Regions:
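Gly/lys/ser-thr-rich phosphate-binding loops in alpha/beta enzymes
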Residues: 112-118, 126-128, 139
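A contiguous binding-surface segment within folded domains or other stable secondary-structure elements
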Residues: 88-102, 111-112
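The feature captures the LRR N-terminal capping module
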Residues: 1-68, 75-89, 102, 125, ...
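A short beta-strand-loop micro-motif that forms or neighbors metal/cofactor-
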Residues: 108
């Protein structure tokens, strides 16, 4: 998808007050700041593109409940996401993320977090603050803390480990 076509898609979604937008598998390298104009969005799926960063304007998507960013080119956790307080599900599988920021603790409504297949070695204690978090997928990371035997037990065991630290 060209930048011009992407801008047209965003403009059409804004005009029609779309609540859901799927732009996966489009070789998108950059998300334009205009994405922040889609203030009615509740579900945004950008999986399988070529994004390396997220524009700060993403913070304007105050109603966003689900964000799919699987299989991008992120080498860091896009901190801008941590201002999306209504976010319930976050998918960042298959990137090159090495660290989850402490600001993840701001996502109080998060129920599911998929971080499989990244390069994360430690999970932040702030994950323990996420009382609604039920599904935490972290396998396929070179985790040191929590240790591999905990990770192999699944979401509930990982969450219990983090919450009792």
């Amino acid at each position: 998808v060209t930048k011009e076509k992407l801008l047209k898609i965003i403009q059409a979604a804004k005009t029609s007050r779309r609540t859901s937008l799927a732009l996966g598998d489009n070789k998108i390298k950059e998300l334009p700041p205009e994405i922040g104009d889609l203030t009615n969005l509740m579900d945004l799926d950008m999986s399988r593109n070529e994004l390396e960063s997220i524009p700060t304007e993403i913070k304007n998507l105050k109603k966003l409940k689900r964000l799919g960013l699987n299989y991008q080119k992120f080498s860091y956790f896009p901190i801008e996401i941590c201002s999306l307080e209504k976010l319930g599900e976050l998918y960042l599988r298959g990137n090159k993320i090495t660290k989850v920021p402490s600001e993840i603790g701001n996502l109080k409504n998060l129920t599911g977090l998929d971080l499989r297949g990244n390069r994360i070695t430690h999970l932040p204690v702030e994950l323990a603050q996420l009382n609604y978090l039920k599904l935490l997928f972290v396998d396929g990371n070179p985790l040191v803390d929590p240790p591999a035997e905990i990770v192999m037990e699944g979401s509930e065991t990982v969450l219990n480990y983090i919450r009792t630290k």
